[in-house]
Amino acid sequence: MTFKACIAIITALCAMQVICEDDEDYGDLGGCPFLVAENKTGYPTIVACKQDCNGTTETAPNGTRCFSIGDEGLRRMTANLPYDCPLGQCSNGDCIPKETYEVCYRRNWRDKKN
């Protein structure tokens, strides 16, 4: 009986997810990836809260964690060297610094890791 109840709950949750999905609420899944820097543990954090994607502007949701260095700041960083990056939070397409810094890295995934 418990197994049947679990199956019923899982089925109901799946049905609710299908009913609630809406591309306008959750953003275009086919959009462009935001550029990221990583912290010491490899956690990726976006470096800009707004970007151009094939002629349209994409904006990260308010409250998203970000490093306020911008795409150009990331491009100027030397790969795999530590930098102190200002940690912030996205607000209306801008990364607002929170007066805290975190060590961050630009990774070059094309490099071979020995």
UniProtKB/Swiss-Prot annotation:
Subunit structure: Monomer.
Organism, scientific name: Rhipicephalus sanguineus (Brown dog tick)
Residues the record marks as carrying a glycan: 39, 54, 62
GO biological process per UniProt: negative regulation of chemokine activity
Name by which UniProt lists this protein: Evasin-1
Family: Belongs to the evasin C8 family.
Effect of residue 28 to A: No effect on binding to CCL3
Effect recorded for residue 109 to A: Significantly reduced binding to CCL3 and significantly reduced inhibition of chemokine activity
Keyword set, alphabetical order: Disulfide bond, Glycoprotein, Secreted, Signal
Gene Ontology annotations for the cellular component aspect, listed alphabetically: extracellular region
Swiss-Prot/TrEMBL domain comment: Both the N- and C-termini are required for chemokine-binding.
Gene Ontology terms for molecular function: C-C chemokine binding; chemokine binding
Job of this protein: Salivary chemokine-binding protein which shows chemokine neutralizing activity and binds to host chemokines CCL3, CCL4 and CCL18. Binds to CCL3 with 1:1 stoichiometry.
InterPro entries in alphabetical order: EVA_Class_A
Broad class of where this protein is predominantly found: secreted
UniProt entry tagged with the keyword Secreted: yes
Signal peptide: 1-20
Cysteine disulfide links: 32-53, 49-90, 66-95, 85-104
Pfam families membership: EVA_Class_A (PF19429)
Superkingdom of origin: Eukaryota
Compartments (UniProt record): Secreted
